[in-house]
Amino acid sequence: MQITALLTGRGNSTLKDKNILEVCGKPLLAYPAEAARKSSLIDEFFVSSDDEKILSIAQDCGFKKIKRPADLGRPDSKHVDVIKHALGVIKEEGADPDILVVLLANTVCVKTEWIDECLREILKTPTISAVVPVVSDLDHHPYRAKKKDEDGFLEPFFDFGDRDISSNREEIGDCLFLCHNFWVLNVKKSVYTDGGFSPWKFMGDKVKPYELDWSIDVHTKEDLIRSENWVKANL
């Protein structure tokens, strides 16, 4: 069973050079990179980016560089296309990953034990297509979502028909949001299938949640401050 880590991050972002901005004295991408490097279960390490600064810093962390084409570095580029491109390059080098740990460069919220526990889930149950971190957030349950009608008034985002929806959040059931820190993919049952649920079809149709208390990915300067606070409290 071959397990490979793939760190992903592009240079073209709204917060300039966010993936390499310092958080508590280290480049942002070093946090997921180092967490993966400390895993005893991962065999190989690659980084995919269109940005040479990202590639060089990740290489310093022990990751082999994959320079992605420009069309995979745009804001509207899809993660699945980045993953497939990287897997193609990895296979050209003679490797054929069974499990791929996709690491997102713009987060500090990754721990080695989290990665290993997700990996062990798939190793124990090979029918699982992916294991992904999630957080519970009942305050933002989709049943509570609204939109504006043509006259500018609020209306339910969904048409519930005659169904009565409770305003008590404890009565409306689970609401789990996918984290953007890392995803563990059982490659043959996920990336190359089309049976998953939108918008992450590449994760396959047997996705196990790995519940976290909190997670953040960086898009603003305020996110950097929150990330620093998390690092000081957790690492």
Tell me the role of every PLM-derived stretch.
Residues 1-16:
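N-terminal nucleotide-binding beta1-loop-alpha1 segment
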Residues 21-22, 47, 102:
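Conserved SAM-binding loop
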Residues 28-44:
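A short, N-terminal amphipathic alpha-helix
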Residues 42, 95-97, 127-128:
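Short, high-confidence coil segments that cap the C-terminus of an alpha-helix
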Residues 45-49, 133:
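Short internal beta-strands
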Residues 52-101, 109-117:
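Short phosphate-binding loop-to-helix
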Residues 81, 108-200, 208-211:
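Conserved core of the sugar-phosphate nucleotidyltransferase
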Residues 195-216, 221-225, 229-235:
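Catalytic donor-sugar/metal-binding loop of nucleotide-sugar-dependent glycosyltransferases
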